[in-house]
């Protein structure tokens, strides 16, 4: 016989926490409220952060399990309802949603690849690529790519050291 593989349960996660309180708007948008349309408007949408969640809920409409809701301008996933079907991942035009292990504790809640000063100007909780998280991680599970922290969940020991050192609080607990 063939031995069955054990599959890690996955869940969708939105890599952005730039809600209405943490990022500003460059202009008032009054067009079609569909995230797929925003890349065609000036600066890719009204939010100062060009990498952040647009907050118009295209992912909400795509989810057949009612697992995503817009909270204060940013999509949030209900881990209990999410079945990791990937429909939200496929439809997000900013590629902010990914499937991560359901038991992943620390996650980078930012997708900005802008340099630190640009990110700081756009969002109060954006990753600035400072590498303090990399230096703090005892398991060598964190790296910085394109001015952005990335956690290898297979190496992560969930100690919280990266999260504690992050000056922008871009690394959070996945609740």
Identify the meaning behind each predicted range.
Residues 75, 148-149:
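Hydrophobic residues embedded in beta-strands of well-ordered beta-sheets
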Residues 160:
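Terminal recognition/anchoring or ligand-binding modules at protein termini
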């Amino acid at each position: 016989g063939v031995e069955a593989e054990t599959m890690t349960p996955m869940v969708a996660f939105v890599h952005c926490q730039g809600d209405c309180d943490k990022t500003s708007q460059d202009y008032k948008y009054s067009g079609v409220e569909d995230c797929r349309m925003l890349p065609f408007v000036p600066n890719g949408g009204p939010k100062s952060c060009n990498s952040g969640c647009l907050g118009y809920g295209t992912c909400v409409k795509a989810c057949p399990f009612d697992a995503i809701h817009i909270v204060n301008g940013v999509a949030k996933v209900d881990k209990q309802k999410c079945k990791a079907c990937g429909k939200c991942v496929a439809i997000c035009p900013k590629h902010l949603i990914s499937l991560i292990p359901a038991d992943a504790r620390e996650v980078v809640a930012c997708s900005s690849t802008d340099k630190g000063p640009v990110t700081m100007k756009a969002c109060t909780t954006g990753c600035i690529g400072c590498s303090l998280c990399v230096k703090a991680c005892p398991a060598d599970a964190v790296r910085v790519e394109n001015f952005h922290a990335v956690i290898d969940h297979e190496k992560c020991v969930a100690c919280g050291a990266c999260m504690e050192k992050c000056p922008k609080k871009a690394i959070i607990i996945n609740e």
